[in-house]
Regions:
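Gram-negative bacterial Sec-dependent N-terminal signal peptides
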Residues: 1-21
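Acidic/proline-rich low-complexity IDRs
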Residues: 6-7, 14-15, 31, 35, ...
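Gly/Pro-enriched, hydrophobic low-complexity segments
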Residues: 23-24, 29-57, 86, 99, ...
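Solvent-exposed N-terminal domain segments of exported/luminal and surface proteins
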Residues: 26-259, 266
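Extended beta-strand-rich segments in extracellular/periplasmic secretory proteins, especially
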Residues: 187-225, 229-238, 295-372, 382
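Long, C-terminal catalytic modules of enzymes
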Residues: 432-459
Length: 459
């Protein structure tokens, strides 16, 4: 009897922890070297040529010496003109290319909101080791779950599911996408009053690191390390009443082994404390609580606990892309009264994966449903929309993509979030006196530990 119970228990555990989604066949994986790009997008352009063929890293004569030093980044397409503009008056003509959120913004601000659409450039690329690992991941990566948390095993330094079969796999591609290895930046995060006045939530020195993208890392070594992935550390210097605060967030690629860890340093308390609420629909204090923590940069939390994900397919959509122009602007030039300045945001036509996330029965969250629009080339969320529990569209996120030739690739560093019955906010504005986002050597596990917050902030 005891033996029977042990065998039954082992079977249940295996079903819960084991792979929920089978890896693709070798024949399918070989498409990454023919009809698909090395990261899983369609290599060919579309029928009318408005989306071009992917041809790898472009040679745009980037001033790499300045970019590596953190100087202001240049716009390779500064001389291009819009092909056309989408407004409230003509959006019906482009309805199938617009997200529900973008249509809602055009309808709410018919006199001022506009999409200027430019020629499409597919600039995303990555180092060869990322391509090689993505090819290997296609047949070795496994989605695992314990019935509550989930994760990925067998995937490192590349896209885990470059030929996705479902929404969960697209979600993990988003979480584990290529975006460099280690960076530092100086950023400002704003919310806006009803009259359009910016309110500084925080000005901070920030560090971000992606341990799963260490060159030469093996799946076995990554597992021994505890599946580390995204690491974030922030030190606030403005506004004055928040100066000295610190925040650290550590995410993994396998939440069945290690869930999100977060710590906060508060000057008034002069100590580091755990911050378990840094996630989900907790108001984000970095931007004065104007957005939720799981809305940052079009993100989803690594760990899947509250939502069911459904892959709705792939379609052509207008998304913010190649927005290097924003790097050279002042904040006054970027902001309008009720939304970003449409004169400075560049939109292009790209193919995106559409993923719908619906709140699980019995789970709590202020947002009942979301749709994510994930760029096929970068696996970044270009936009997402959120609906409240009455079925009304409520929240709209827009995340411009920038070309970073020194990484290389298209990365997201700031976003605009609109609450349709409230205020709007923006994160990751690289302000004038500081320096542009720049690559740095990886920090050690000790440096990305909670003691660093208190040591850095002793006054």
């Amino acid at each position: 009897m005891k033996t029977h119970i042990k065998l039954l228990s082992a079977t249940i555990v295996a079903l819960l922890i084991g792979s929920a989604h089978a890896a693709v066949t070798q024949e399918e994986a070989d498409q990454l070297k023919t009809t698909l790009t090395p990261l899983g997008a369609e290599r060919a352009g579309n029928k009318d040529g408005s989306i071009p063929e992917w041809k790898g890293c472009p040679d745009l004569k980037a001033p790499l010496d300045k970019l590596k030093a953190g100087d202001r980044r240049w716009d390779p397409y500064a001389n291009e003109k819009p092909l056309y503009s989408v407004t409230a008056a003509n959006m019906a003509q482009y309805e199938d290319k617009l997200s529900e959120g973008v249509k809602a913004l055009l309808a709410k601000y018919p006199q001022t909101m506009r999409l200027d659409v430019y020629p499409t450039h597919r600039n995303h690329c990555a180092p060869d080791y990322v391509y090689e690992n993505t090819y290997k991941n296609a047949t070795r990566a496994k989605y695992v779950t314990n019935g509550k948390e989930d994760g990925v095993e067998g995937a490192v330094a590349g896209i885990p599911f470059p030929i996705p079969k479902n929404g969960i796999e697209v979600r993990w591609n988003l979480n584990m996408r290529w975006r460099g290895v280690a960076f530092e930046s100086k950023d400002r995060h704003y919310s806006f009053t009803s009259s359009g006045q910016p309110v500084l939530g925080s000005q901070a020195h920030q560090f971000e690191q992606y341990d799963a993208y260490q060159e030469g890392l093996t799946p076995e070594e990554h597992a021994k390390q505890g599946y580390p992935n995204f690491k974030f550390m922030q030190f606030v210097d403005q506004p004055t009443f928040r100066a000295g605060e610190g925040l650290m967030v550590l995410d993994s690629t396998n939440c069945t082994v290690q869930d999100r860890q977060a710590w906060q340093y508060l000057v008034g308390q002069r100590r580091v404390r755990r911050a378990p609420t840094v996630g989900w629909d907790t108001p984000d204090f970095v931007v004065s609580g104007s957005n939720f923590f799981d809305e940052v940069f079009g993100s989803v939390l690594s760990c899947n606990e509250r939502y069911e994900y459904k892959l709705l397919g792939k379609k052509e959509m207008l998304i913010p892309y190649n927005n290097n122009k924003l790097f050279s602007l002042t904040e006054k030039e970027m902001f309008g009264q009720n939304h970003h300045n449409p004169d400075v945001l560049r939109w292009e036509l790209h193919r995106v994966w559409v993923v719908e996330a619906t709140l699980k029965d019995g789970k709590r969250h202020a947002v009942q449903k979301r749709k994510f629009y994930v760029d096929e080339d970068t696996w970044s969320t270009a936009m997402f929309d959120g609906w409240d529990h009455s079925g009304k569209i409520w929240r709209v996120s827009i995340s411009p993509a920038y070309y970073f030739p020194d990484v290389p690739g298209m990365l997201i560093h700031n976003d605009f979030l609109y609450v349709l019955d409230g205020a709007w906010s923006t994160r990751g504005v690289m302000y004038e006196p500081g320096f542009q986002m720049r690559q740095i050597p990886m920090k050690s596990k000790t440096e990305f530990g909670p003691d660093t917050l208190s040591a850095r902030n002793i006054r």
